[in-house]
Amino acid sequence: MKAIFHEEATCDGARAGQVDTPGGSFTTPCFMPVGTRGAVRHLSSKDLGDLGAEVVLANTYHLMLRPGVEVVRDLGGLRGFTGWQGLSLTDSGGYQIFSLQPRVDDVGAEFRSTYDGSIHKLTPEGAAGVQADLGADIQMVLDVCSALPATDAIVRQAVDRTSAWAVRGRKAFLDHPDAQQRQCQFGIVQGGTNVALRTESAQRTLEVGFDGYAIGGLSVGETR
């Protein structure tokens, strides 16, 4: 696994650089406009380019339910579906699913669609496969985001499941016939506001060997 981030400048602990993906590069720090269903509301692809956007964040939960991953895939992935020729990142859908109070076990999360009431189950393997079909330049592994405030026992369970799912999601990504040639996959660190669990989660996620890493489970109820 080669490094995809290249540091170009630092200042008092902050740093700027470039991230390289199979589909192109973007500079950091980077603001990613949100295109929940692939497109950013009220803005055309040209508008986004004129504003200097480099990466658009799309939502796996919504895209897999409407219009459906098959539609996006058959249109050539997110680039063909939206017309946006810049880079894109898809989340795993986990945050939206966990807001629906799903039935969660070690296998995955079962939830009811907010569109038609149908029942679905998303697993780490399924999330990796769906995002491979959506074709974003960066996909995120499925994780467990515990709402805050939460007891240490609940956060511990989230960390353990996140770590186990990270291993499974990474294997599914690496086993996919061509995902590695088209995408990067990022792991997600959990742990709530518990420093020890955050540290443990970071270490366990690093050991899996993702292309990049995200800090998950923030801005969901913590006081600061």
List PLM regions with ranges.
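Glycine-rich phosphate/ribose-binding loops and adjacent secondary-structure elements
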Residues: 172, 176, 180-224
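Non-catalytic, usually N-terminal nucleic-acid engagement modules in DNA/RNA processing proteins
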Residues: 1-178
